[in-house]
Every structure is written in structure tokens, then in C-alpha cells.
Amino acid sequence: LSNTNNYDGVVDETGAAEVTVTVGSEANGGNFGFDPAAIRVSTGTTVVWEWNGLGSSHNVVDEDGSFESELVAEEGHTFSQTFEESGTVEYYCTPHRTMGMKGVVVVE
């Protein structure tokens, strides 16, 4: 998570059926972060990204292209992904990627 100034270690959410990540949290010189930036989950966990309406339009795009949300600015919008296989999934916001708007899901 280079260039991601709100990264504060991996938040352990193993055992949870659903985990919420805020889109547009304060980071990287504005509302250009995911909070938490890195989470650890169990296989079968659904991650729900929820937009807070700050920092203009954001999206959630997997580095390997397996999922991509639409570009949205509205507060309360959600995008979900269920992780069925173990591994590390890196994702980012397309317009703010170079600013450090990136995240990681570690699936165990």
C-alpha cells in the first residue's frame, strides 16, 4: 500500500460474515481513502464498500480485473463482493489511484 497514508496495519475481521469498508474516507490529502485500507477476512466473507459522499466520484476496481464497481459520488451507494478463495486482493479507485486511494483484502 505504497503512497496510502491512512494504512495502519491489517484489520482482522476473520469470522465475520460481512465487513463494511468506507469509500471516501479522509486520507491522502482529502477524502481519497478506503477505511480500513487493509482487512483480513475468512473465505466466504462479503465485503461491502459504502460511499460516504465525500471526495467526488469513486469506484472500486480489483487489480486483476475480477470486479469493478461503477463510478459513483452519492452517499449511501454500496458495492459488494464475496470472497470465496484465499489470497490477497488489491484494489483501487481509478480516478484517485495515483493519490494513494488503494486497499487490500487478505482472504484466509
Residue ranges and their predicted role:
Residues 1-12, 73-108:
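Extracellular/periplasmic metallocenter environments
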Residues 10, 31-33, 66:
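Residue-level preference for alpha-helix termini and adjacent loops
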Residues 15-43:
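N-terminal edge beta-strand
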Residues 18, 46, 57, 102:
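Exposed beta-strand and adjacent loop surfaces of beta-rich binding modules
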Residues 21-23, 60, 105:
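Bulky hydrophobic/aromatic "packing anchor" residues in well-ordered structure
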Residues 25, 45, 51-54, 64, ...:
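A mature extracytoplasmic/lumenal domain signature
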Residues 36-54, 78-83, 89:
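Beta-strand cores of secreted/periplasmic/IMS beta-sandwich domains, seen most often
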Residues 52-75:
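Histidine- and aromatic-enriched segments that form or immediately flank copper-ligand environments
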